[in-house]
Amino acid sequence: SPDWPGITFPGGHVERGESFVDAVIREVKEETGLTISKPQLCGIKDWYDDEDYRYVVLFYKTEHFTGELQSSDEGKVWWEDFENLSHLKVATEDMSDMLRVFLEEDLSEFFYYKDGEDWSYQLK
């Protein structure tokens, strides 16, 4: 997708009346063709915009799925070995640290903040 010129996670929005878990299941199905179950909340990414509105992205992961990968209008999908990710183009420069929130038990938050005019982040 032109909006995400590189590897990124499946994702999207929560529809009115939809739970977070149901949104994760729906978005993964729409973008990958996989039917997942038992998604577990494993972290958040959050920030405030210039008008002090807070944005929160929820990270979920699961090992429970059925089906075959199918690319969609959102982009091409494929399985990739974790060790190869550092050699591939990723959609955002912070992808390796986002992955740490998914994988490291002692991390649960990826917090962006303004440091003067620049954006910085902390892993917590």
Feature-to-residue mapping (PLM):
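Active-site-adjacent beta-strand/loop module that shapes the phosphate/pyrophosphate-binding cleft
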Residues: D46-E68, R100-V101, E105-D106
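Conserved Nudix-box catalytic region and its N-terminal flanking loop in Nudix hydrolases
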Residues: S1-K29, E117-K124
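Short loop segments at secondary-structure junctions
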Residues: S1, T62-E68, F82-N84
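N-terminal strand-loop-strand
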Residues: S1-F9, T35-I36, Q40, T62
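Charged phosphate-binding loop/patch that engages nucleotide di/tri-phosphates or the phosphate backbone
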Residues: V101-K124
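NUDIX/MutT-family hydrolases
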Residues: Q70-F102, Q122-L123
